[in-house]
Amino acid sequence: IRLPKFYNAQKTVLMEEYKNSFLHLDLQKWQLKKEISLVYNELNYFNEKKKLLKKADSIFTQYFNRADLRLKKGESNLLEKATAENLRSQAEMQLKSLEKDREISIQKLSFLINDGTFYQNENAKYGILNLENLNAEYAGNPLVLKQLEQEKNIQNAKLLAEKAKLSPSLNLGVNSMTMKGNGADEKYYNATHRFQSGFVGVGIPVFNSAQKSVIEAQKVNQLIAENNYQLGLINLKNQYLQNLRQFQKLNDEISYYQKTGLQNSESILKTANNQYFNGEINYLEWTLLVTQAFEIQNKYIDRLKETNDKIIEINSLKSE
């Protein structure tokens, strides 16, 4: 029979592991929430890209129809029509590819939520998400740190449990036997007589070098858990700072596009169309200008997605 200290130590290990299982579940929920947010942002991004590609497809289709008409009238050559057809075909292929990517993201969203319902994102205006208050003295994600702290508690409890195995044990026993024949007292005993005896002893571990080695190994596990906590904290702080710096860089680009870039792209697009239809520029100049205008709008949408991804990462690192 072990002393209560031994059983209490074993119970503590089980209780700490039990607590850790709930923290693991909370971590999975936390990670799932971030993944859903990233996929949802991706779907909104695809919607915005689709609008831009449809706009480009419409303009390139008009250009193709005009080039085809000019060719029939002998006002242009085959190269202009081929260029127009190529631009229109590229826009169509990009739309089809985008739709496939969007279907994959929709399936991923439904898979992550996993409640048997098919989900899609709302067709809302695409803009920058809300960023929670920034804290220069970021101290790490509470949920992740709790789990790392709990790992330390488990290893501490296991060390105490291994040490408890060196504690003495109580040995209790009862013997019951029969004897047939003459006993030491020269009396005759038949098989119906039973003789009982008992013993009480204390077991003290003497050859315990193996267990002491186990204890030393557990001390190493204890140090590993402590190091993992410190490394986890450093990693969280580095992630936060990296995402914050990338967000600030992207936010500067977004400001440029919103204040200047988008207005310039619309101005280029409008002016290029007017000059081309009035015969002031040729189709090569028009193609260059229109492509440049759409590239500005395309980059703006890309930067919006990247900025929102960083906001999701930053908010997630601060939330539980």
Residue ranges and their predicted role:
Residues 29-146, 243, 250, 293:
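Periplasmic alpha-helical coiled-coil/stalk elements that build and connect Gram-negative outer-membrane
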Residues 10, 17, 21-24, 35, ...:
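Charged, solvent-exposed faces of alpha-helical coiled-coils
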Residues 2-32, 54, 79, 83, ...:
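Sec/SRP-type N-terminal targeting helices
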Residues 9, 122-124, 182-188, 217:
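Outer-membrane beta-barrel translocator domains and adjoining extracellular loop/strand segments
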